[in-house]
């Protein structure tokens, strides 16, 4: 069984990932949704030829790490290995105006608070605030938060959570920079490969590394329909819209090992990269955060330990318009 706080750094061949590509999103990127099947097949064959030409030249990369975790309100509390400081996990991103490792105030957290499940020994931890729906997905349903799918610290038993990132060699795009058509083809294929890498990694995590679903036997189509146990919400997607959360992911994973660098807004370079969390709870499900109000914005900024106006920039598209 994969050990908690162990990292898995993976490199994949392009041919390993082709079965995991979700071509529906590729067609959507090309404006072919609803178009004749022949049009889709034509561009797919061009894409497969390009992928074949990459086989011996390029790869994709992934990092997965399993942590002990507990929820505290709408926050996730990640317990860090004792060697974190030497490994650079406790570095902050203050140069970007974001401080990630925190006991709530932007400083590395250590605690012996027995009442919330953090043991008497001084353990390092990282507080990872989540956002909660202010309007349910459907009438009668609860307002969801990803922290709902993690065992509360107050129960005295720790849960587990996975953290991951994937990327595609960024040099691919440069090769086609002088041809608009093939540049777009390379970019859309790279985006699909980053997602396909996450799909394949998630399968390996469920069945082997984390191993909470060792007997899973799903087709690729079933995986694309998300019929597996658990979820892998990605940063920047509907339930995790705050791209500055990538600074927290970086502190947990050291994303440069997968060739990923962050801009000052938390966007990943190369563009064809994915990062996020993996939950194993059988009832965990994907949801859209929707719009949040000024009250939650201010509370979230406080929990992140950053100025409200800075956080407003990251969550602009998720705010209720006045």
Where are these regions (language model features)?
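Long, intrinsically disordered low-complexity tandem-repeat segments
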Residues: 87-111
